[in-house]
Amino acid sequence: MSQNHTILQNLPVGQKVGIAFSGGLDTSAALLWMKLKGALPYAYTANLGQPDEDDYNAIPKKAMEYGAENARLIDCRAQLAHEGIAAIQCGAFHVSTGGIAYFNTTPLGRAVTGTMLVSAMKEDDVNIWGDGSTYKGNDIERFYRYGLLTNPALKIYKPWLDQQFIDELGGRHEMSEFLIANGFNYKMSVEKAYSTDSNMLGATHEAKDLEFLNSGIKIVKPIMGVAFWDENVEVSPEEVSVRFEEGVPVALNGKEYADPVELFLEANRIGGRHGLGMSDQIENRIIEAKSRGIYEAPGMALFHIAYERLVTGIHNEDTIEQYRINGLRLGRLLYQGRWFDSQALMLRETAQRWVAKAVTGEVTLELRRGNDYSILNTESPNLTYQPERLSMEKVEGAAFTPLDRIGQLTMRNLDITDTRAKLGIYSQSGLLSLGEGSVLPQLGNKK
């Protein structure tokens, strides 16, 4: 194997090392360890509007206590909202089960974090970056790509790829004892039956007990909504309206939001009251191994439902088909950490220009429990849905007449004749059996 000089396998002593600092056990122990071993750690914390984070301002202070040369809090929420809306506009969601999608909320968060934190590091002349991603996951590749896109001179140092760090602090217990031994009164939190990663757009629950498919969604405690499967949790039906202007969500229940962050937070509150957007997915990681996750995304789900309702009422069939096909392709690129690659930008621009621009209107829904909802009304000045065209009643100025339909059907004789000839060829070659007892018995009936 050729040596990758971009990835440093040993601690760069005496050099500035940026670390994506969450304030949790792993990054706290890593920061202190790097400091004691002679590196110059700089801490960067992304404010992504995580629903399970109470006090962002306390995180950089904690980093300084653990020995950071400097610690910065980077507000990434506006950019995250922007990318979330772009994903909605493009339908960039390729993982789904039974029609319920995973809204790629973690990949969107990584695209924002990976670019904005490395950009902040460049301002501080920090060109070595570390984060908490493991070698078996997706994030190690996502951060690698986004980091190098932002700073081509970037070097990567991850304590979790450094054998010395692993030998000395290989587990949560060792990390906790290390902090205590160095004078920090660190109380290790009780481990959950799964791990959680979240941002303003959604939450991911995975690993540990959730690696076993006989552990279902019921072991998860939602952080963005309610446990809708629990009959003891009261969930009342609720009507909600969502308004789009040129593909951008701008209003909820008639109230306009100039700040997309506030819009998302309110959408999360509305959808969360019902457990909307929760899903259980088996997916293929970038390395092709399968993993399983339980996901929450109440606001993304609400916007997606309303947006697609308008798309189907405004655009023609071929446009909708291309929107869906391109959305699947773009969703996979986003998942792989290629959200800013040229092939992804091409697909994004196509959807945002030719699909989203026409999506203006308002959709009213009734939300119930989980992903159970009904669409109550759809309004748009751009609707091509015109029921009078297909009315079963006698109408003046009809779009077409019975005679027109006869002509249209007669034209179909051309391809019907061609199709019948093809079926005969397949029969003669043994690919298709015609006649009595076959899948197409009527075609072989010469009586």
Swiss-Prot record:
Organism: Neisseria meningitidis serogroup C / serotype 2a (strain ATCC 700532 / DSM 15464 / FAM18)
EC numbers for this chain: 6.3.4.5
Gene encoding the protein: argG
Subunit text: Homotetramer.
Alphabetized InterPro entries for the sequence: Arg_succ_synth_type2_subfam (IPR023437), Arginosuc_syn_C (IPR048268), Arginosuc_syn_N (IPR048267), Arginosuc_synth (IPR001518), Arginosuc_synth_CS (IPR018223), Arginosuc_synth_type_1_subfam (IPR023434), AS_cat/multimer_dom_body (IPR024074), AS_multimer_C_tail (IPR024073)
Binding residues for ATP: 20-28, 46, 132, 134, 139, 197
Pfam families, sorted: Arginosuc_syn_C (PF20979), Arginosuc_synth (PF00764)
Keyword Ribosomal protein: no
GO molecular function term, any single one: protein homodimerization activity
Any coiled-coil regions, as ranges: none
UniProt cross-references to NCBIfam families, sorted A to Z: argG (TIGR00032), PRK05370.1 (NF003779)
Lineage: Bacteria, Pseudomonadati, Pseudomonadota, Betaproteobacteria, Neisseriales
Binding site residues for L-citrulline: 102, 138, 142, 195, 204, 206, 283
Protein name per Swiss-Prot or TrEMBL: Argininosuccinate synthase
PROSITE patterns: ARGININOSUCCIN_SYN_1 (PS00564), ARGININOSUCCIN_SYN_2 (PS00565)
Subcellular localization: Cytoplasm
GO BP annotation list: argininosuccinate metabolic process; L-arginine biosynthetic process; urea cycle
PANTHER family, per the entry: ARGININOSUCCINATE SYNTHASE (PTHR11587:SF2)
Lineage: superkingdom: Bacteria
Presence of the UniProt keyword Nucleotide-binding in the record: yes
Keywords assigned by UniProt, alphabetized: Amino-acid biosynthesis, Arginine biosynthesis, ATP-binding, Cytoplasm, Ligase, Nucleotide-binding
Annotated family: Belongs to the argininosuccinate synthase family. Type 2 subfamily.
Catalytic reaction(s) noted: L-citrulline + L-aspartate + ATP = 2-(N(omega)-L-arginino)succinate + AMP + diphosphate + H(+)
